[in-house]
Amino acid sequence: MNRPLRHIAIFCGLLVLALLLRANWLQHVDRQELAQHERNARVRFERFSTPRGDIIVGGKAITGSKETESRDYAFRRTSKEGPMYAPVTGYASQSRGTSLLERTYDSVLSGQDDRFAFRHAKDILTGQPRRGGDVITTIDAKAQKAGYKGLTDLGARGAVVALDPRTGKVLALVSTPSYNPEVFAGISFKESDRFTALEKKKDKPLANRPL
């Protein structure tokens, strides 16, 4: 074999080796990350296959789940006083994924956390549907409402954060202008367009100003 052909053969061999190593990396190292990625359809289906757990403020749920007619997305997220609490909860959208508490505690809210394994086994034996777990916040409903009302009455673009000086617990987390996570919680093109419209607004309602 002459020298140019030998160089080409070596190059092709190295290229094949690199591709094999990359495929092996994806299969064995990145498998878990890819399996849990938000763009993975299976992840999205599982997230909305059962009622999500609630996010709790002052002993009351400020989120919920509503049954749909979709086979793939059996439930969609609902919000109570959505604009006031959006800087706390974030959103859980069938088309846009999750943010803030909805993302941080997604495995708990969707019931996929390993700590629920025993409960899921019990539910299967008793014929109960799988349930998500609740997330209890330190937010004080009165403080949150006062901060939100103060900013909206002024028509201001700003933020309010209130902390307990003794413990550091977050009592209020307000950002205005805000948005209602429920209006784009579904998978429809119309709801996706609503999210896009919010992204394009000059006053940036999706921005979480306290953070």
Can you annotate each of these PLM segments?
Residues 1-159, 173-210:
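Extracytoplasmic/periplasmic proteins that interact with beta-lactams or build/remodel peptidoglycan
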